[in-house]
Amino acid sequence: MLAGGQAMAGDLLQWQTNSLTYLYGKDFQVNPRIQQTVTFEHADGWKYGDNFFFIDKIFYNGKEDAFAGENTHYGELSPRLSFNKIFDQKFEFGPIKDVLLAMTYEFGEDDTESYLIGPGFDLAIPGFDYFQLNFYNRHTEGDRPGDDVWQITPAWSYTIPVGGSDVLIDGFMDWVVDNDVNSKGEYHANLHFNPQVKYDLGKALHFGEKQLYVGVEYDYWKNKYGIEDSQGFKTDQSVTSFLVKVHF
């Protein structure tokens, strides 16, 4: 979630923002049902593109996951190279204001590593702080299913003034559109929709804007982890979590 940014002096790093988020939610699927998560996020813009990184530390409230134990971690690193910046020309047409080479590295415990690459676009949509649309071809580490499938990932931010403060609606969606089958098993198309609705409490209390947020995160995941939902094993997830987020 790219909320706010701090302008930086110098030619290489143009802006950056860092944050810590605490989330508490119930009714997760596949993993233990109650989860507390601490997330570190970093985003920046630099001379030739932008970067986004996050890592989750997930606690299962004393329960044990079959593979990860009482806690686990998961993260993603997503650099993008901007054609506008690299070629010093405007690659703009219609709503598209920049064309990028988008990449993502997914990592965590167990067999989770994947490498994603494809075209990305920054869109100018009225009212939005930003709107990104990335198309990835996924490549898994090892021989597990889910290799060479396509994923569509929009990410967005929208600010609504409310009284003396703001409500920020931001988030992403990962939509893997293909199925894959190999000797190790099956991987099903899945959709992960993850918006946050946050109130700028810091601005309301005159601590400074875009520094302290409270709100909720909604996590919908159809066929979580690419596992097909069934009567015997539910993998369709719908969870609302409470959150507190601090930018620094």
Show where each model-derived region lies:
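Short loop/turn motifs that connect adjacent beta-strands in outer-membrane beta-barrel proteins
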Residues: 9-16, 48-52, 83-100, 124-132, ...
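Transmembrane beta-strands of outer-membrane beta-barrel pores
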Residues: 22-28, 57-61, 103-109, 135-141, ...
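Membrane-embedded beta-strands of outer-membrane beta-barrel proteins
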Residues: 40, 77, 117-119, 154-156, ...
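Short glycine/proline- and aromatic-enriched beta-strand/turn motifs that initiate or cap beta-hairpins
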Residues: 9-58
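Outer-membrane beta-barrel "beta-signal"
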Residues: 236-248
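Surface-exposed loop and membrane-interface regions of Gram-negative outer-membrane beta-barrel proteins
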Residues: 54-105, 190, 224
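Outer-membrane beta-barrel transmembrane domain signature
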Residues: 140-211, 220-223, 246-248
